[in-house]
From Swiss-Prot:
Gene: pcrB
Keyword Lipid biosynthesis: yes
Function: Prenyltransferase that catalyzes in vivo the transfer of the heptaprenyl moiety of heptaprenyl pyrophosphate (HepPP; 35 carbon atoms) to the C3 hydroxyl of sn-glycerol-1-phosphate (G1P), producing heptaprenylglyceryl phosphate (HepGP). This reaction is an ether-bond-formation step in the biosynthesis of archaea-type G1P-based membrane lipids found in Bacillales.
Organism annotation: Bacillus cereus (strain ZK / E33L)
Protein name: Heptaprenylglyceryl phosphate synthase
PANTHER family: HEPTAPRENYLGLYCERYL PHOSPHATE SYNTHASE (PTHR40029:SF2), PTHR40029
GO terms of molecular function: heptaprenylglyceryl phosphate synthase activity; magnesium ion binding
């Protein structure tokens, strides 16, 4: 079993986007700590299974970030369950989770499942619009969400999600200073090694996603920038 607490760099692959076999091999052999499969829309059991089978040809740990209960399948090493803490809709905080537990609770392997406390901070992002996230928040608000995840809910992961835009480094630094047990994941807008390295100063885990589809070489350079290997 892998130890997610030591992961510094992960790639996130969207099953609804095209990725060549050659580029997938580059991602999986890059030295990244894990590959997360997940997206905000167009996620189906078929494209998740296709992605799983493709990634399983390699030794890299593989995580399904669950956005649709209908697209859950066995075979992943871990399952990340996002709870959007700044959503205005309860369904994205605990609602869909309750439904999933009602349907699948008896067969879940709890050692493979980790809850993520999301704070979505880009109002233009698909995930923000889907979940009706309250993105016009102050730093104090974000710190409070971090405390909620870390100290009240005792979640293993607090995820700052800028999704498509590069975030506020000072805010990431201040959030990290508040967390005692939760690991801080940062995702959003990383387009080069310098940005990845900058966020890695404070985030426990840097998530690199969109740049994979725009500039594979730049994406691959983020691994060494974060891990320093």
């Amino acid at each position: 079993m892998y130890d997610i607490s030591g992961w510094k760099h992960v790639f996130k692959l969207d099953p609804n986007k095209e990725l060549s076999d050659e580029h997938l091999e580059m991602i999986c052999e890059s030295g990244t700590d894990a590959v997360i499969v997940g997206g905000s829309d167009g996620v189906t059991i078929d494209n998740v299974l296709h992605m799983l089978v493709s990634i399983r040809r390699y030794a890299v740990p593989c995580v399904l970030e669950v956005s649709d209960v209908e697209a859950i399948t066995p075979g992943f090493d871990f399952y990340y369950i996002p709870s959007v803490l700044n959503s205005r809709k309860v369904e994205w905080v605990t609602g869909v989770h309750h439904e999933a537990l009602k349907e699948f609770g008896d067969i879940m392997d709890w050692d493979e499942i980790f809850m993520e406390g999301y704070c979505v901070l880009n109002p233009e992002a698909k995930v923000a619009q889907l979940t009706d996230a309250k993105c016009d928040v102050t730093e104090d608000d974000v710190i409070a969400y971090a405390r909620l995840a870390d100290k009240l809910l005792r979640l293993p992961i607090f995820y700052l999600e800028y999704s498509g835009t590069y975030g506020d480094v000072e805010l990431v630094k201040n959030v990290k200073a508040e967390l005692k047990q939760a690991k801080l994941y940062y995702g959003g807008g990383i387009s080069n090694a310098e940005q990845a390295k900058e966020m890695a100063q404070y985030a426990d885990t840097v998530v690199v996603g969109n740049i994979i589809y725009d500039d594979i070489k730049a994406a691959l350079k983020t691994v060494k920038a974060v891990k320093g290997e």
